[in-house]
Amino acid sequence: MKCLLLALGLALACAAQAIIVTQTMKGLDIQKVAGTWYSLAMAASDISLLDAQSAPLRVYVEELKPTPEGDLEILLQKWENGECAQKKIIAEKTKIPAVFKIDALNENKVLVLDTDYKKYLLFCMENSAEPEQSLACQCLVRTPEVDDEALEKFDKALKALPMHIRLSFNPTQLEEQCHV
């Protein structure tokens, strides 16, 4: 009985720890993700990360630019103080090709889950720091059109993650997301 209680206690302690994305893309070619992208869908572990137009992780990716050093420059737009602001984030390469380190938007990692390079890219931003662990993911597409295949892959990837809010955008919204 003592062993059962100990095992149960350990299981609960481990389950309450970090929100961890375990599946990232193998063999990411960072040069192939370069170019214009549109945020088709977003999801987050905490409703407050996306619920309002100016929510902390409600960002609209505009362009991905690999740097000569192998890092990834992310150009995005975000609502701040009632207007659209352009931001640039440098995601530093790590030993894992699909994982990047960032120090922006209160997040500390960008993880590429999947991409076909031509139509869609799925990624998550993770903050594993205590006590405010959080996870926000996006489905990016190359054109301002709804891509059902990309959305299916996004929904499949989210099944294993603790998401509590999900937003998706129609073609008009994709065109008008947040223009500077």
From Swiss-Prot:
Q: Which family does it belong to?
A: Belongs to the calycin superfamily. Lipocalin family.
Extract the signal peptide range. 1-18
**Functional description taken from the UniProt entry:** Primary component of whey, it binds retinol and is probably involved in the transport of that molecule.
Modification after translation = Alternate disulfide bonds occur in equal amounts.
Organism listed in the record: Bubalus bubalis
Q: What is this protein identified as?
A: Beta-lactoglobulin
Subunit structure comment from the entry? Under physiological conditions beta-lactoglobulin exists as an equilibrium mixture of monomeric and dimeric forms. Interaction with LMBR1L is controversial.
Q: What superkingdom heads the lineage?
A: Eukaryota
Q: Which cysteines are joined by disulfide bonds?
A: C84-C178, C124-C137, C124-C139
Question: What does UniProt note about where in the body, tissue by tissue, this protein is expressed?
Answer: Synthesized in mammary gland and secreted in milk.
Which keywords has UniProt assigned to this entry?
Answer: Disulfide bond, Milk protein, Retinol-binding, Secreted, Signal, Transport
Protein's cellular compartments: Secreted
Tell me which GO cellular component terms the UniProt record holds: extracellular region
One GO MF term:
retinol binding
| Gene name as annotated | LGB
